[in-house]
Amino acid sequence: MAPTKKGEKKKGRSAINEVVTREYTINVHKRIHGVGFKKRAPRAIKEIRKFAVKEMGTPDVRIDTRLNKAVWSKGVRNVPYRIRVRLSRKRNEDEDSPNKLYTLVTYVPVTTCKGLQTVNVDEN
């Protein structure tokens, strides 16, 4: 690596270590296109998990039971096209765990996903 030039800021700590909560709309339909009927809902759960790992940068992802019920609400074949989720990056209380942070994925019930964008949610 080249030495830092005069006037350049030094890199601070990574934003991945911050505790943060965001709401996303996931287009499940495009992620399970071409998947066989009996594997659609299980694949949707796997794709939501993959999305959370990519967005939050934590390999430890925990999916809420309400989100699981929402994905399975129309059966194994007819998964909802879009689903609104809240991704919360949290500190791991378990000391012997290899990961300092984990991501909790919860379901956000909405009537329609039209016009919704990714938003940061304030911690309450």
Swiss-Prot record:
GO terms for cellular component: cytosolic large ribosomal subunit. The keyword Cytoplasm applies. SUPFAM superfamilies: Ribosomal protein L31e. InterPro entries: Ribosomal_eL31 (IPR000054), Ribosomal_eL31_CS (IPR020052), Ribosomal_eL31_dom_sf (IPR023621). One of its GO terms (biological process) is cytoplasmic translation. Keywords: Cytoplasm, Ribonucleoprotein, Ribosomal protein. It is found in: Cytoplasm. GO terms for molecular function: structural constituent of ribosome. Pfam families: Ribosomal_L31e. The keyword Magnesium does not apply. Belongs to the eukaryotic ribosomal protein eL31 family. Component of the large ribosomal subunit. The ribosome is a large ribonucleoprotein complex responsible for the synthesis of proteins in the cell. Component of the large ribosomal subunit. This is Large ribosomal subunit protein eL31. It comes from Paralichthys olivaceus.
